[in-house]
């Protein structure tokens, strides 16, 4: 059985959604950032960078959310084509999320929600760049139902971030193709199950406190 080390974050949800979509059995280990469980010697042996998510499959550890998605797709032969061009298209959009949407929206989250000082220049910079990336997604989705044509790990990687656009103060208004994509993916039963792993705290203030504490870690 796959061991999943995770938390209720967009990156964590990528992997739980993929596991649910693939129907793979897994055991959840929900790590507490408040308790610095992602920095324990035991977890650092799984991910030397001390970040979630990570998995252990039959003694083999995989860290970095994109690498985990590729591993699961290749393990099962699903959610990514086997031909070179189809695989490349999935990986292009996966890397677009990993190198663009995730980092930019992550910084928008930090400066809009968590940073102790209000740095309007930083807020504007990251919100505007995140919106620009959303517009790229919208243009792509005007010509394809999903990012790589068929539903794939590229969509699974991107959806958990875009769905929380409000948290970063970024609008999807006017992006009708992106909105359609969000709605379609959000209706998938496996996606709905994956978003509950692990359960997100109901108290918004506790989320903010936890995130603020991580700024110095």
Residue ranges and their predicted role:
Residues 1-131, 138, 143, 211-212:
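GST-like domain detector, emphasizing the conserved glutathione-binding G-site
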Residues 55, 68, 137, 155, ...:
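Residue-level signal for nonpolar/aromatic packing positions in well-ordered secondary structure
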Residues 36-37, 73, 183, 202-204:
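Short secondary-structure boundary/hinge segments and terminal tails
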Residues 100, 105-109, 146-174, 179-187, ...:
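GST superfamily/GST-like fold recognition
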Residues 32, 153, 198-201:
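Short, solvent-exposed turn/loop segments enriched in Gly/Ser/Thr/Pro and often Arg
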């Amino acid at each position: 059985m796959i061991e999943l080390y995770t938390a209720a974050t967009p990156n964590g949800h990528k992997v739980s959604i993929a596991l649910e979509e693939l129907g793979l059995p897994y055991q959840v280990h929900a790590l507490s950032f408040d308790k610095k469980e992602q920095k324990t010697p035991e977890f650092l042996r799984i991910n030397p960078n001390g970040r979630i998510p990570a998995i252990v499959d039959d003694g083999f550890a995989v860290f970095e959310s994109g690498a985990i998605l590729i591993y699961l797709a290749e393990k099962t032969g699903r959610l990514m084509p086997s031909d070179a061009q189809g695989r490349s298209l999935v990986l292009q959009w996966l890397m677009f999320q990993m190198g663009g949407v995730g980092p930019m929206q992550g910084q928008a989250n930090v400066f809009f929600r968590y940073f102790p000082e209000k740095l309007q220049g930083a807020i504007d910079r990251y919100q505007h760049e995140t919106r620009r990336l959303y517009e790229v997604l919208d243009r792509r989705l005007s010509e394809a139902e999903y990012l790589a044509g068929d539903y794939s790990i590229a969509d699974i990687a991107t959806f958990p971030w875009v769905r929380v656009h409000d948290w970063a103060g970024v609008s999807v208004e006017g992006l009708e193709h992106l909105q359609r994509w969000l709605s379609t993916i959000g209706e998938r039963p496996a996606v709905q199950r994956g978003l509950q792993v692990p359960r997100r705290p109901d108290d918004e203030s506790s989320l903010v406190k936890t995130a603020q504490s991580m700024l110095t870690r």
